[in-house]
């Protein structure tokens, strides 16, 4: 008590605390000077958080575009003289996603534009769930990814792998659907106004695996023929052919190759069934897969707006698999849905050739300003399809 001056202080928010000032007989004692806070701009915060729109946007982009983990984010903030817990980061992201969810209906309308082509794929993730008995454990869940290159939209949908998930989302979609041959998609073969097309890249992978992993020399002939199909597609893109020209060249150049593929496949399977030749298990799988879904694999030749494969969608899945690799899984289903929301807008911005950071900053600036007309906000920030 002889060495320090003691003071009890109450701040403007009502918080009370004590501080000690060392006594110095040689230093002139002066009264405290209080700062006039009205002279400074008070930062505008995103509702339900202590974050500005710019800071929240940085957190979103770092996590969902660059796959930076929470631990690395915390160390980054320490370097900037800031300290923040993981729970605070998660809560801010959750509140930010709650605002963005209101824009997803507009994105979905653009995605399912009648007459357009959508590409669909899915990938697994381990998610912590609580069952009916209250027991907590990890279960395998799926992230469905749907891409529309015409409207430049990407949509992430979290759920199980049951066909009801994608069936309910797509509804009675009128257009063309490109997928692999997973059984959940076969439902769309029954829809009158929906053309289901299967991906040739999946077929090629099976033959490549039979050749490389199983050393089956018979697979190489099919790989070479599929390569000719891709050569035609490269020429279509390089020469900038119209949809009518694409259909014409596919009919003239691709159809003969396709007929050759089918004849060779059925002939090999027939010889195998009569024990005349031996086939590796992987080549059997490839031949059966191709012949079983031949109608869907042939369908692309008649539609000039459809690509030969689903690779554009698989590229959109990759950011999610990077997250899965870095984070290991989701600690809650709510966290999985938050991820789906943010990835939808990150990948849509990339398809539209705009920076995701600019979109999020613009969006949260509107939120802070009090706007809640989400459809108009989405149209103002993104490129609305014609």
What is the meaning of each model-derived region?
Residues 1-386:
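Catalytic center-proximal scaffold of phosphoryl-transfer enzymes
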